[in-house]
């Protein structure tokens, strides 16, 4: 009986999730008629639409979901002798503020100006800076490592292609970004919604990552346990026409 109840619960949960995602995607498509990309993400931030009580960047940015990567990203930076990092989008800097920046120059960038102004007020130091940057349209600063967590999952295919092409223009050395390594296929969304992506599958076709950090994500009852931060040398990532 317990197994039957669990199966029934999962079935209902998946049905509700599909209806909810349809509503969200439809709502975002309507907004795209009148709103810019900046408007969409500013609205999400100002109204806490990702719904975490600790971080306006969402539940994936609270300390419970980032405890593994705080340690592993630090190890990666040391291993690959990273001296400067561009974190885009940096969000509200909630979990990253726990990082040890003693031997690292950090630039946090985001499309939401209000976020950046708040981060400057709270966290700016001689080696920690923030700036407003549109990942798709603006010139991106060159860095040893471009860190792009929980970003491309919110972009349409078209906007992911634009973002990757813009990142490659920087001649930076490495890209570390969110990757769901066990997903077998990718589906498109309007920018501002969310879904998992596997960058090694079509239509992206990234090569095998140089490094994979499993986040041990427990969100949504461990549905996303394959969530990782994957590292590539930028020169090995394809450009898109």
Where are these regions (language model features)?
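Class I (Rossmann-like) S-adenosyl-L-methionine-dependent methyltransferase catalytic domain
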Residues: 2-142, 155-241
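Hydrophobic adenine-recognition pocket in adenosine-nucleotide-binding enzymes
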Residues: 151
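A conserved beta-strand element that flanks and buttresses the S-adenosyl-L-methionine
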Residues: 147
């Amino acid at each position: 009986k317990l197994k039957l109840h669990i199966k029934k619960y999962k079935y209902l949960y998946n049905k509700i999730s599909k209806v909810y995602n349809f509503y969200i995607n439809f709502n975002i498509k309507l907004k795209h008629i009148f709103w810019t990309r900046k408007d969409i993400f500013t609205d999400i931030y100002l109204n806490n639409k990702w719904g975490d009580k600790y971080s306006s960047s969402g539940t994936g940015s609270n300390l419970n979901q980032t405890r593994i990567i705080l340690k592993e990203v630090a190890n990666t930076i040391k291993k690959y002798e990273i001296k400067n990092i561009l974190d885009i989008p940096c969000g509200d800097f909630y979990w990253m503020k726990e990082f040890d920046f003693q031997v690292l120059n950090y630039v946090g960038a985001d499309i939401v100006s209000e976020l950046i102004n708040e981060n400057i007020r709270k966290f700016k130091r001689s080696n920690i800076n923030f700036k407003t940057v549109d990942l798709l349209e603006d010139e991106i600063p060159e860095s040893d490592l471009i860190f792009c967590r929980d970003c491309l999952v919110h972009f349409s295919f078209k906007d992911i292609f634009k973002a990757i092409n813009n990142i490659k223009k920087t001649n930076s050395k490495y890209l570390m970004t969110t990757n769901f390594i066990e997903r077998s296929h990718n589906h498109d969304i309007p920018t501002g919604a969310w879904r998992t992506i596997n960058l090694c599958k079509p239509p992206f076709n990234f090569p095998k990552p140089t490094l994979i950090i499993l986040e041990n994500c427990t969100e949504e009852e461990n549905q996303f346990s394959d969530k990782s931060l994957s590292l590539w040398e930028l020169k090995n990532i394809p450009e898109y026409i």
